[in-house]
Amino acid sequence: MTLLNPYFGKFGGMYVPQILMPALYQLEKNFVDAKKDSNFQKSFFNYLKNYAGRPTPLTLCNNLTNGTKTRIYLKREDLLHGGAHKTNQVLGQAMLAVKMKKKEIIAETGAGQHGVAAAIASALFNLKCKIYMGYKDIKRQSPNVFRMKLMGAEVVSVESGSGTLKDACNEALRDWSRNYQKSHYMIGTAAGPHPYPTIVKEFQKMIGEEAKKQILEQENRLPDAIIACVGGGSNAIGIFSDFIDEDVNLIGVEPAGQGIETGKHGAPLNHGRTGIYFGMKSHLMQSQEGQIEKSWSISAGLDFPSVGPEHSWLNSIHRAKYVSITDIEALEAFQILSKKEGIIPALESSHALAYALKLMYLDPKKEQVFIVNLSGRGDKDIFTVREILKKTEKKHESL
Amino acid sequence: MSRYKKMFQKLSFLKEGCFVPFVVIGDPSLEMSLKIIETLIENGADALELGIPFSDPLADGPIIQKASLRALYKKNTFLQCFELIENIRNKYLHLPIGILLYANLVYNYGIKNFYYQCFRSGLDSVLIADIPIEEYEPFYKIANQYNINSIFICPPDADDSLLSKISLYAKGYIYLLSRPGVTGIEKKTISLSNIFIEKIKKYNSLPLLQGFGIENPTQIQKSILSGTNGVICGSAIIDIIEKNLNKEKKMINEIKNFTSKLKKATKFVQS
């Protein structure tokens, strides 16, 4: 029996081979204990403040919105140690691993942001760290691979399947089912079997709590909308969490990749069906026959064919709205923010920003306040972007 | 009496262990798959465990994963897999046949439609690799309506509460895991302790089949000596398929020899 509800409506659950159930129960019990343990909580917040650098600022973008009546604030998770919101929850999970007396961390990563975070937390807590990463992602995120290795993590290249995050997830689960007695599987997003979606949300909810306090200080009111990108959905659920019961629009932005009509996207909430995969019942990109389909996004961090179960639930009860942004639109937002505000956003976060800009251009005279969760910084993406821009320039020259 | 029950009774009378081979339907093609399965049956398989190919088989190691991908590459449909099963059923009326697959395939097809299809094709059992007993209820109810045995996996570190749950739900046989991890051949020798097996037997009287890592006669004899009723062998057979993809005759010949050798190992008389 679980201590907490494993479901969000009909989504969630624990769909794993039987062998992993004791490890999930152990994790849930330790998580429930940790929530009640004031020493654990104090220590966690101490790491967040004095190691990771919380609270992160809420920045108003004046140049970006010039000539309109929209005010866009960025929740600056890019300024967190490690360069993304991922650091928050890995600190919590590493502390749980220590509490469970596990010696090793297994993790998987797409963009490398969670891999870097897992390597950071493992180094800090003296845990051995093994990170699974698709061979394609290793190529497109080489600076992050180097960072992980510098911090002592072993990066395992996954050659099977499509060689991206989906396959890295499978490999990590396989490793865990062999080594659960000594290893903790540090899932990087609010997805996977219970209790992961609940744990990750708990360890990311400070994003929303801080943002709420900060916007009330700066605007004296709540925003009209919170906008965040959604791959697995951890930064989005983190910033949504404290606004779910408020009168605020919650908007999740999925990657439309090369365009929904091309099939090369990563938007299971709008263009997938409910299914069972990666330990959970949630929305899923799948074929007519129920085989899991490959996803696509310019941003490796959003390149995942499923989504955390709480997002599927928020979508089903129409509490949050999920939209999609193409690679090209995200790239434009990436360049605009860099140029206008001197902030290079992660390609993931650029999707959220692109949607905010879209809303702003749609009705420039409307007075509205948005908070965009700038979930990570874009240093890791500059090479990808440079390559694409080079190709586009060549195309223009030849015209 | 169910086909499993009859088969286990017969083997117990003959003082033999049970040998169950596992292959993935459609690997390397539907046509070859049928030939392979017939070879397995003709050379001593007491029952069959057949895999329905899935894109992300996370309870399986690289050998079975590649087999699934080879099968999927041929774009055979879900229903074509069932046609093959029906084909075998019509030819071998008394042979227990089970399938192993992943939850999304069942869910996508509709749980009720799925079990109806199993019933129509003459299947005896279904094992869903990524559904633990805790999430089994919706599947179990309908499986029972169609008289399909639900097979449960018993890990080597199962505690009393899990053993008692398995004894309540399991039908046909219990799939005993040799070790933690995923399917595949590992160098470490595998044997389950007699004490653990006796403990399981206290909870129920269903036959026990040991799976994961079975590849040679010694392991089979050890398994039966420890108190199991037999073994399931998958990756070692699929390894033969993989190594002989373009040598059909050699592949069938090797499978034939391997199957006879492993079946023979189940025939030693227990003292």
Swiss-Prot record, chain A:
Gene3D superfamilies: 3.40.50.1100. Keywords: Amino-acid biosynthesis, Aromatic amino acid biosynthesis, Lyase, Pyridoxal phosphate, Tryptophan biosynthesis. CDD domains: Trp-synth_B. It comes from the Bacteria. It catalyses: (1S,2R)-1-C-(indol-3-yl)glycerol 3-phosphate + L-serine = D-glyceraldehyde 3-phosphate + L-tryptophan + H2O. The keyword Amino-acid biosynthesis applies. It is an enzyme of class 4 (lyase). Its EC number is 4.2.1.20. Signal peptide: none annotated. Its cofactor is pyridoxal 5'-phosphate. The modification N6-(pyridoxal phosphate)lysine is found at K86. SUPFAM superfamilies: Tryptophan synthase beta subunit-like PLP-dependent enzymes. GO terms for molecular function: tryptophan synthase activity. Pathway: Amino-acid biosynthesis; L-tryptophan biosynthesis; L-tryptophan from chorismate: step 5/5. GO terms for cellular component: cytoplasm. Pfam families: PALP. Belongs to the TrpB family. Tetramer of two alpha and two beta chains. The beta subunit is responsible for the synthesis of L-tryptophan from indole and L-serine. This is Tryptophan synthase beta chain. It comes from Buchnera aphidicola subsp. Schizaphis graminum (strain Sg).
Curated annotation (Swiss-Prot), chain B:
Its EC number is 4.2.1.20. It is an enzyme of class 4 (lyase). GO terms for molecular function: tryptophan synthase activity. CDD domains: Tryptophan_synthase_alpha. It comes from the Bacteria. Keywords: Amino-acid biosynthesis, Aromatic amino acid biosynthesis, Lyase, Tryptophan biosynthesis. InterPro entries: Aldolase_TIM (IPR013785), RibuloseP-bd_barrel (IPR011060), Trp_synthase_alpha_AS (IPR018204), Trp_synthase_suA (IPR002028). Pathway: Amino-acid biosynthesis; L-tryptophan biosynthesis; L-tryptophan from chorismate: step 5/5. The active site is at E49 (proton acceptor), D60 (proton acceptor). The keyword Transport does not apply. PANTHER family: TRYPTOPHAN SYNTHASE ALPHA CHAIN, CHLOROPLASTIC, TRYPTOPHAN SYNTHASE, ALPHA CHAIN. NCBIfam families: trpA. Tetramer of two alpha and two beta chains. The alpha subunit is responsible for the aldol cleavage of indoleglycerol phosphate to indole and glyceraldehyde 3-phosphate. Belongs to the TrpA family. This is Tryptophan synthase alpha chain.
